[in-house]
Curated annotation (Swiss-Prot):
Entry-linked PANTHER family: PROTEIN EMI5 HOMOLOG, MITOCHONDRIAL (PTHR12469), SUCCINATE DEHYDROGENASE ASSEMBLY FACTOR 2, MITOCHONDRIAL (PTHR12469:SF2)
GO CC annotation: mitochondrial matrix; mitochondrion
GO biological process: canonical Wnt signaling pathway; epithelial to mesenchymal transition; mitochondrial electron transport, succinate to ubiquinone; mitochondrial respiratory chain complex II assembly; negative regulation of canonical Wnt signaling pathway; negative regulation of epithelial to mesenchymal transition; protein-FAD linkage; tricarboxylic acid cycle
Primary gene name: Sdhaf2
Primary location: mitochondrion
Gene3D superfamilies xrefs: Flavinator of succinate dehydrogenase
Family under the similarity heading: Belongs to the SDHAF2 family.
KW Chaperone (keyword) present: yes
SUPFAM superfamilies: YgfY-like (SSF109910)
Originating species: Rattus norvegicus
Name listed for the protein in its UniProt record: Succinate dehydrogenase assembly factor 2, mitochondrial
Transit peptide residues according to the UniProt entry: 1-27
Amino acid sequence: MAVVTLIPTLARVLSKHSLLSPLLSVTSFRRFYRGDSPTDSQKDMIEIPLPPWQERTDESIETKRARLLYESRKRGMLENCILLSLFAKEYLHNMTEKQLNLYDRLINEPSNDWDIYYWATEAKPAPEIFENEVMELLREFTKNKNKEQRLRAPDLEYLFEKPR
């Protein structure tokens, strides 16, 4: 009787292993920003290929602002959700079209949200392509010189207020 109850358990364990082993044998364990080579500490990361970023030239300025506001709020990590949504609330409505394009590239081209966070906090240097006026603005904002509490993304009520 014990052998009969053991067989389904053994079958489940073997089926889980047999499902994962082909994936693990062909998966590349790398993650890096385009153009950078992985360091030893990054060799255990799984690389997920993303389509290359393309500038949207057929988009109106208001549509771009709305999209960037959404993309600033919906990130892959909480730290950037908070940081970028507060930054967008403060600066997005006053940005020129050129600055909006630079911000679009900054938040959408890197394949890893941690890169953006490290560049904004100056923990790592940003690639030359991202060294621009918007990155400087983001770095200054990240320093939080006014010592504001930044514990969560802003509520959306400010979208319905009259512009300052």
